C-alpha cells in the first residue's frame, strides 16, 4: 500500500498582535501579517494535497477562502501557543491518515512550492527534521514521518529542535539553498530581503516596483469623481486626489462606495492596494 502523502499545518495568531517588530503604520503592519500568511499558505497548498490551519479566529476559514486560499481551519481548543497549536494540528492530520506532517511558520512571503517539495524529499531519510531560518537560530519548517511532531518553535528553536533529535536539513541535502524557505520576516530588513527574493502575489500587491519597497500608507476616502480614463478617484487624509484602479481592490472589495474609507498603499498618485 502506498504511503499517504504529506499534509501541512500552520498556526496563525490574531493579526492584530502579529509582526509587532515591523516599524510601519499599524494598519500596514496588520496587512503585511495577513498577506505574508496568505503567501505562505498559497505555496504550501500548491505543494501539498492538504493543509490545516490552527487558529482561535472563528471567521478565519471564510476570510481565507475569500482570499483564494482553500484550507481547513480548526480551533486551538485551549491549546495556547504555537507549539501546542501545531501539536494539535499534527494529531488531526495523523487521524486523517497522513503519515507525514510538515509544520511551517506563517511569515514566509517568498516561499515557493518547489522549495517545499525539495525539503520534503530531503527529509525522507529522517524521522524528524527541520529547516533553520536564515540566521540559523530559528526554524521555519519542521517535518515528522510516523512520529510525534514535538515542535519547539520560538526563541532559539533550531538548537531546541536539534537537541530534541531532529536533523537539520542542509543546503547540500536539499540540493538548493532554498533562501525563500529560510527567510521569515520579523523586521524591515527581513522584509527587504524577502522582496528581493520575490514575494507571493498577496504581499507583492503592497510593493512599489519602482523603489523595490512598500508603497506609502494612506487612509483614503472614495469619491464620486473619476479621472480622464474613467478610473475612480479617492482623497487621502492630507487632501490629495489619487487614482484607485479596480485591480487595487483585490478579492475583498468589488468596488469602493462613495464616502467609504479604506486603508491603502500608493505610489506616484495611484493606489497599489486597498483594503478595509
Regions found by a protein language model. Name each.
Residues 249-265:
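Short nucleic-acid-contacting surface segments enriched for D/E, G, S/T with interspersed K/R
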Residues 212-229:
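Structural detector for short beta-strands of small beta-barrel domains
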Residues 110-136:
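Conserved donor-nucleotide/metal-binding helix-loop-beta segment in metal-dependent transferases, i.e.
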Residues 1-22:
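N-terminal nucleotide-binding beta1-loop-alpha1 segment
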Residues 65-101, 157-159:
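Short phosphate-binding loop-to-helix
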Residues 162-214:
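Conserved alpha/beta core of the MobA/IspD/sugar-nucleotide pyrophosphorylase nucleotidyltransferase superfamily
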Residues 266-276:
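OB-fold/S1-family single-stranded nucleic acid-binding modules
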Amino acid at each position: 500500500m502506498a504511503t499517504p502523502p504529506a499534509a501541512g499545518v500552520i498556526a496563525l495568531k490574531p493579526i492584530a498582535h502579529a509582526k509587532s517588530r515591523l516599524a510601519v503604520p499599524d494598519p500596514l503592519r496588520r496587512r503585511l501579517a495577513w498577506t505574508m500568511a496568505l503567501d505562505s499558505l498559497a505555496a504550501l497548498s500548491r505543494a501539498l494535497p492538504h493543509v490545516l490551519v490552527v487558529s482561535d479566529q472563528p471567521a478565519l476559514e471564510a476570510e481565507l477562502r475569500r482570499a483564494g486560499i482553500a484550507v481547513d481551519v480548526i480551533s486551538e481548543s485551549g491549546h495556547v501557543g504555537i507549539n501546542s497549536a501545531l501539536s494539535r494540528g499534527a494529531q488531526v492530520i495523523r487521524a486523517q491518515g497522513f503519515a507525514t506532517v510538515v509544520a511551517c511558520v506563517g511569515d514566509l512571503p517568498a516561499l515557493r512550492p518547489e522549495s517545499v517539495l525539495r525539503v520534503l524529499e530531503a527529509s525522507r531519510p529522517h524521522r524528524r527534521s527541520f529547516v533553520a531560518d536564515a540566521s540559523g537560530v530559528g526554524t521555519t519548517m519542521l517535518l515528522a514521518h510516523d512520529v510525534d511532531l514535538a515542535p519547539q518553535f520560538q526563541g532559539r528553536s533550531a538548537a531546541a529542535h536539534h537537541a530534541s533529535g531532529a536533523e537539520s536539513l542542509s543546503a547540500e541535502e536539499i540540493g538548493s539553498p532554498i533562501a525563500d524557505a529560510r527567510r521569515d520576516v520579523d523586521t524591515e530588513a527581513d522584509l527587504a530581503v524577502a522582496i528581493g527574493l520575490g514575494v507571493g502575489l498577496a504581499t507583492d500587491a503592497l510593493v512599489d516596483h519602482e523603489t523595490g519597497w512598500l508603497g506609502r500608507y494612506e487612509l483614503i476616502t472614495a469619491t464620486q469623481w473619476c479621472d480622464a480614463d474613467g478610473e475612480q478617484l479617492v482623497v487621502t487624509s492630507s487632501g490629495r486626489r489619487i487614482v484607485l484602479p479596480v485591480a487595487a481592490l483585490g478579492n475583498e472589495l468589488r468596488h469602493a462606495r462613495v464616502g467609504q474609507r479604506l486603508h491603502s498603499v500608493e505610489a506616484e498618485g495611484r493606489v497599489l492596494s486597498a483594503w478595509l
